[in-house]
């Protein structure tokens, strides 16, 4: 049985700002293509990236209610080493849902600082990844 996380996903992450007056576009943290594979049962690997950047991913998934995956992304971007950790939950299908597209929702934490201290370690954002058709 193939992991439900395997495939290509449109990834978007957001600043966790509760102020509804903040424009939606100002909440953007990152966006890219999340491509996940299953090198062995219970494992995930792949890439997350966009124009000019890419992180190599490695981690694991667990079946449950809901299914969840935890993985780390790392890569050298503009001569700096980036490391982020992710936890995501596969959104359960609604019994009466119409044309529901699979989605992963979760959070990401910046594990190592980068950009000369402008991007501090420990920053947390929320993300959604929607399966590409």
Language model features by range: what are they?
Residues 11-13, 44-50, 70-78, 106-109:
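Short beta-strand segments that buttress and anchor functional surface loops
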Residues 28-31, 53-58, 80-87, 121-124:
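Short, surface-exposed coil-to-beta transition loops
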Residues 35-43, 62-67, 91-105:
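Short, solvent-exposed coil/turn segments at beta-strand boundaries
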Residues 1-30, 104-111, 127:
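Tryptophan-anchored aromatic micro-motifs
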Residues 21-60:
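N-terminal glycine/threonine-rich, aromatic-flanked beta-hairpin/loop signature
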């Amino acid at each position: 049985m193939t992991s439900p996380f395997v495939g290509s996903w449109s990834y978007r992450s957001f600043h966790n700002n509760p102020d509804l007056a903040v424009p939606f576009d100002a909440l953007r943290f990152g966006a890219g293509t999340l491509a996940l594979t299953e090198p062995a049962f219970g494992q995930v690997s792949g890439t997350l990236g966009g124009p000019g950047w890419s992180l190599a991913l490695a981690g694991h998934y667990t079946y449950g209610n809901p299914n969840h995956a935890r993985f780390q992304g790392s890569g050298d971007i503009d001569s700096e080493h980036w490391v982020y950790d992710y936890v995501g939950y596969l959104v359960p299908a609604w019994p009466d849902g119409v044309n529901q597209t699979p989605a992963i929702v979760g959070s990401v934490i910046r594990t190592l600082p980068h950009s000369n201290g402008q991007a501090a370690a420990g920053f947390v954002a929320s993300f959604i990844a929607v399966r590409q058709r």
